[in-house]
Amino acid sequence: MISAILDTGALVGWLDEDDQWYAFASTHYPQIRSLALTCDVVIAEASFQLNDVPDGRDRLLEMVQTGALHVLSVLPEESGAVRALLRCYGQRMDYADACLVRLSEIHRHHVIVTTDTKDFRVYRRFRREPLPLLTP
């Protein structure tokens, strides 16, 4: 079983059968422990992307309500670390990515499940450690 931190693309892929990442997500979700982590901004992004998916947003929030997905907020406690990540990576990193990298620093035994291989292969924990990733 995998202890996971979920990115937007992986979540949307799991909940939308028409999404390009559905096969990836549906293959790997059975391996993920029931308590996956994500951050609040990923929920906002996924909710927006699932707007036109029948029951997509409802199923997303059901995962939160049932405890299958634990949503963490990194602000205000981790604002200094998030700011440092955003400064380090500049325009390449958005706020959601910075939050996920910070969660990976805090929850060191979790794997980030993402479809964004381009950026997450560049990001580092503590500026030097490659992130543990599960990607397509």
Mark where each language-model region is.
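Metal-dependent nucleic-acid phosphoesterase active-site entry motif
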Residues: 1-19
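Acidic, PIN/NYN-like endoribonuclease modules and their adjacent C-terminal/linker elements
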Residues: 1-3, 106-136
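PIN/NYN-family metal-dependent endoribonuclease catalytic core
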Residues: 5-6, 24-52, 66, 71-74
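Terminal helix-to-tail segments of small alpha-helical proteins
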Residues: 8, 17, 59, 64-65, ...
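Alpha-helix/helix-capping structural signal
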Residues: 9-10, 41, 77, 118
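Amphipathic alpha-helical segments within well-ordered protein domains
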Residues: 12, 44-47, 83
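Residues that scaffold the ATP/ADP-binding catalytic core of kinase and kinase-like folds
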Residues: 14-15, 49, 123
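Active-site neighborhoods of divalent-metal-dependent phosphate/nucleic-acid chemistry enzymes
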Residues: 71-115
